[in-house]
Amino acid sequence: AGAGSGKTRVIIHRIAYLIFEKKISPYNILAITFTNKAASEMKSRLEKLIGVEGEKVWTSTFHSMCVRILRREIQNLDYSPDFVIYDTQDQLSVIKTILKERNLEEKKYPPKLILDRISNYKNQLIGAAESSKYALNYFDEVITDIYKDYQKKLFSFNGLDFDDLIMLMVRLFRENPEVLEKYQDRFKYILVDEYQDTNKAQYELVKMLA
């Protein structure tokens, strides 16, 4: 269904139905949206419709859900729970440092383009180590080498970028089935607003939780 066709309203009423008709605990319901604005709107509409029970439903964006879980569980991946989230400017400055270290010109290898390529890899759940398999030419190979350096640097700073949040959640669940099981037990019902917009990493994450 397209934008403005009332999908969010359907999700909110579905949650109310689960709580009041099916007697499902709001604690066992996860509602995911794509933007902070949509998440807070959903929260307030839920509370208006069902009162205090609405506060107990875990309503968040994909990324804020991942931050919440990773703060509790990321030591399983050898990061520390007080990890820093890098914004675009931080990411670009890491890329520029790597270009200098590798004596590569920014004109030939625009940092913004490199970031976009790294982001695409992560959204397809392609890690730095395996990215070189997908290189089609010399330019691609250089990008995958930069990707490897970039991940090493972020890891050494205990830093994550936005795409890491979802990619690392998938890795966390794959490598630690007992952690996945804990959240599968918690989230008996998962509702995703704008589900048609999910990329591969987001789709995989929802599939694992479900």
Spans of features found by a protein language model:
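P-loop NTPase Walker
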Residues: A1-P81, I85-Y86, L92, F157, ...
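Short alpha-helical elements of helix-turn-helix
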Residues: H13, K112, K200-Y203
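Amphipathic alpha-helical segments within well-ordered protein domains
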Residues: A16, E47, K96-K100, Q151, ...
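Conserved helicase NTPase motor core
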Residues: L30-A31, A38-A39, D87, N137-A210
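ATP-hydrolysis module of ASCE/P-loop NTPase motor domains
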Residues: G54-V57, Q75-D164, F187
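Generic alpha-helical structural context detector
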Residues: S64-R71, D116-S119, M167, R171, ...
